[in-house]
Amino acid sequence: MSRNTEATDDVKTWTGGPLNYKEGFFTQLATDELAKGINEEVVRAISAKRNEPEWMLEFRLNAYRAWLEMEEPHWLKAHYDKLNYQDYSYYSAPSCGNCDDTCASEPGAVQQTGANAFLSKEVEAAFEQLGVPVREGKEVAVDAIFDSVSVATTYREKLAEQGIIFCSFGEAIHDHPELVRKYLGTVVPGNDNFFAALNAAVASDGTFIYVPKGVRCPMELSTYFRINAEKTGQFERTILVADEDSYVSYIEGCSAPVRDSYQLHAAVVEVIIHKNAEVKYSTVQNWFPGDNNTGGILNFVTKRALCEGENSKMSWTQSETGSAITWKYPSCILRGDNSIGEFYSVALTSGHQQADTGTKMIHIGKNTKSTIISKGISAGHSQNSYRGLVKIMPTATNARNFTQCDSMLIGANCGAHTFPYVECRNNSAQLEHEATTSRIGEDQLFYCLQRGISEEDAISMIVNGFCKDVFSELPLEFAVEAQKLLAISLEHSVG
């Protein structure tokens, strides 16, 4: 391990032992961190540290007050111990890399928000160990998020030459307030649900992207989220806007150190697609999975896209292999006539992981189309659930939907569950739904073993074939990474 990392016995077990989570290292560095607990004073302190304008503070406070009136939902098909929201710190950042660290010791001090203000040598080394480029050189633009703050954003100036805004959420509030105010909360309101309201109250850095009219983004845009501090949550807010006749492909990845207690990740993503625009949004999720109700990330995320204009198109693609519990439904509201929504998902659970994930396709405009391809793989003692909603509104004349929901079981102690909901309120709509549940057959394994292929390699090959419809939608280099993570997650799941 590099000099900035600390390896406990637990970390060594996870990173090099049977469970093989190589991203589980912890970065030792000075931090500026709020005390545990959440109240109105904490919300104000977060806003002050980020030097936000009054309108952003009001957005936070309104969401916090709405959150206080809500009850935490528990209808998902998964179990976790009751969370104590006063036992988390809601702001943690590396002590500013461009000063002598005295600011970190002053209560309420305002941190720097400029580019690379938090990129200390320890933080840069951590991202280097993760294989995430925080300096320009590779033809992919990266926004690197470390706990509550963005520490580096590459290719901003090159993208700006074409009018593309690619920056952290915090920088967008200061540099492009008119755009943030126009779109913030329009797709996911501050009081949308329990975890979205919590996010709106304590929102940390996510990524802000705006692609202007008629521009095709010349490179992949990406964000990497790293949780490092103990007993913190990550609550990034991401907004992506594709103006008329534009195109952008965006991908996000993530990881966290090994911890023996739950950490909460409650993000919100809002995507707005205007007339004739297209967005491809890909996720390779690799949060620390924990084991048998011990540690891991609780991944409770709200993601929603609004296809506002005619002929707009949104594609969600996700590979979910990490986190103790995944609870998320990337969704599309198809308001524009002839708009298209797509959802391609691979969700693998192993060990004692639990997942309740799927999508919602809300058809409002005429001639709207949606496609749902979901692949769920269960191994070990895990439980994997698909939950989807297809809703055809009365105005959605000639709406079309195709749903394919496939589950695969590996072993005798896991479970696969499906909860499809269909609501059709227009007689001209056409909906198709296919579903299968299968096991890896003994004859398949026997065939591979007879040809010198090990049992683990055989299972990996079969599972990759099962997932090919989804992996083909990912950018090539990320599809390769997703396949590797799938293989690692399946290790030692045989038997």
UniProtKB/Swiss-Prot annotation:
Q: Name one GO cellular component term.
A: iron-sulfur cluster assembly complex
Q: Report disulfide bridges, numbered on this chain.
A: none
MF terms in GO: 2 iron, 2 sulfur cluster binding; 4 iron, 4 sulfur cluster binding
Pfam families given in the database record: SUFBD_core, SufBD_N
A single Gene Ontology biological process assigned to it is: iron-sulfur cluster assembly
State the oligomer form and interacting partners.
Answer: Part of the SufBCD complex that contains SufB, SufC and SufD. Interacts with SufA.
Q: Which family does it belong to?
A: Belongs to the iron-sulfur cluster assembly SufBD family.
Q: What does this protein do?
A: The SufBCD complex acts synergistically with SufE to stimulate the cysteine desulfurase activity of SufS. The SufBCD complex contributes to the assembly or repair of oxygen-labile iron-sulfur clusters under oxidative stress. May facilitate iron uptake from extracellular iron chelators under iron limitation.
Q: What is this protein called?
A: Iron-sulfur cluster assembly protein SufB
Q: Which organism is it from?
A: Escherichia coli (strain K12)
